[in-house]
Amino acid sequence: MFQRKTLQRRNLKGLNLNLHPDVGNNGQLQEKTETHQGQSRIEGHVMSNINAIQNNSNLFLRRGIKKKLTLDAFGDDQAISKPNTVVIQQPQNEPVLVLSSLSQSPCVSSSSSLSTPCIIDAYSNNFGLSPSSTNSTPSTIQGLSNIATPVENEHSISLPPLEESLSPAAADLKDTLSGTSNGNYIQLQDLVQLGKIGAGNSGTVVKALHVPDSKIVAKKTIPVEQNNSTIINQLVRELSIVKNVKPHENIITFYGAYYNQHINNEIIILMEYSDCGSLDKILSVYKRFVQRGTVSSKKTWFNELTISKIAYGVLNGLDHLYRQYKIIHRDIKPSNVLINSKGQIKLCDFGVSKKLINSIADTFVGTSTYMSPERIQGNVYSIKGDVWSLGLMIIELVTGEFPLGGHNDTPDGILDLLQRIVNEPSPRLPKDRIYSKEMTDFVNRCCIKNERERSSIHELLHHDLIMKYVSPSKDDKFRHWCRKIKSKIKEDKRIKREALDRAKLEKKQSERSTH
């Protein structure tokens, strides 16, 4: 059905996800069928068949389509003194951090009006946006043509006219769409859900197939509280930043988004899919193999060559964001660095990124675990804060443990961690293992508490650890490592699936024996 000539093949990279509500006086949905140049009109019975297999906009593979999927299967069998009290400086009339319970997103309170977006910290919501220093105005999100309001007709997405019945936030969202001239759009039935990638308090991420061009994408679904203009404004501002970032080898590509207001009240974002997942996922898979006894805990998956390539990809992506767009990521951690089997490193989730004003960002937001000392103390924050986070991430990758110890996500646990970051000595690679002088020096230069003494991104890009592995042969070795990781991830999924099947079978047998 997806292969009918009535479905036009489109390039997803040039996609604009535009939606239009078409509601009658009785509030019922009215179906519309878009006619395209060079295409015949979609027949009503085709649309009915599509509706029959659609369940909450999540479609699953049919047998005929499954044969078309050709994911690269590159399998490979190779294998302290008394601490001082932390003083958090909070400028007057500036946002201040409010730690809320785990069931809620931590926000930044302000004396400004409600229209000023609240900041959602990344440790409990990776999709939050940082506000600019001024209140939201149409100019801050001008030209955001890829965000739209929901489709009332489930089969097509097009630019809607403004409606008086919409909330102010939704109206502002539509204002950003005015002037969209690109006629490209996507049909919802073209997206086929393949499986879940991850889920959290802030939403879910699934792997999906765009059928017309056989493109695999990642689809994020972010629930939004009904008529919550604060959250919507945050997401609009964040997506406006991401949309304006042009494709780059070390930045995840943004394809489009739309706001589904009337059906599930959620924002859906489409972006580039990385088949090896995040560094955090790879680290979790490694730990499961260690627990099974099939991998030695003394032999890490992240050798020096791998660390060099990862560090270069992160630094190059950060440098691009800063030089071209004056953006600081501010949330560098394993879960926000993605890898694919082609050997590409990608930065994602600009959840607390902020466009710089006067080249300095001083708002207290971000993931507290990887937060630099100067941010905790309320000092001015620059791009060197991401360098600190990179150093902590490298230590975690090679050791398998966060260098500053564990903590809980309660306010007391977070405050204890912040005290340790400021008062304890700078993290270092463990002395009970052997690391090269290049690796040790690189980490030491990242994890310097005094920001002025900490190395810059430019300096680290020319560090011996990076330059040591710059060659085509080293690139080939890293791609080989990525393919092995992809194979290990598949193996881990198979083992977990088999264990689940055995558990279900044992449960059934136990229930039968009791009867």
Swiss-Prot record:
Residue sites binding ATP per the record: 197-205, 220
A Pfam entry, by short name: Pkinase
GO molecular function, one term: protein tyrosine kinase activity
Phosphoserine modified-residue sites: 359
Keyword Zinc: no
Coiled-coil regions, chain positions: none
Gene Ontology terms: biological process: cell integrity MAPK cascade; invasive growth in response to glucose limitation; MAPK cascade; pheromone response MAPK cascade; pheromone-dependent signal transduction involved in conjugation with cellular fusion; pseudohyphal growth; response to pheromone triggering conjugation with cellular fusion; signal transduction involved in filamentous growth
This enzyme's EC code(s): 2.7.12.2
UniProt catalytic activity: L-seryl-[protein] + ATP = O-phospho-L-seryl-[protein] + ADP + H(+); L-threonyl-[protein] + ATP = O-phospho-L-threonyl-[protein] + ADP + H(+); L-tyrosyl-[protein] + ATP = O-phospho-L-tyrosyl-[protein] + ADP + H(+)
Keywords associated with the record: ATP-binding, Kinase, Nucleotide-binding, Pheromone response, Phosphoprotein, Serine/threonine-protein kinase, Transferase
InterPro entries: Byr1-like_cat, Kinase-like_dom_sf, Prot_kinase_dom, Protein_kinase_ATP_BS, Ser/Thr_kinase_AS
Class of the enzyme per the UniProt entry, highest EC level: transferase
Active site: 331 (proton acceptor)
Entry keyword Kinase: yes
Modification type Phosphothreonine: residues: 363
Regulation: Phosphorylated at multiple sites in response to pheromone.
GO cellular component: a single term: cytoplasm
Limits of the Protein kinase domain: 191-466
Origin: domain of life: Eukaryota
Outcome recorded upon mutating residue 353 to A: No loss of activity
Family that this chain belongs to: Belongs to the protein kinase superfamily. STE Ser/Thr protein kinase family. MAP kinase kinase subfamily.
Summary of the function given for this chain in its UniProt record: Serine/threonine protein kinase required for cell-type-specific transcription and signal transduction in yeast. It is thought that it is phosphorylated by the ste11 protein kinase and that it can phosphorylate the FUS3 and or KSS1 kinases.
More details: Present with 672 molecules/cell in log phase SD medium.
The protein's name in its UniProt record: Serine/threonine-protein kinase STE7
Gene: STE7
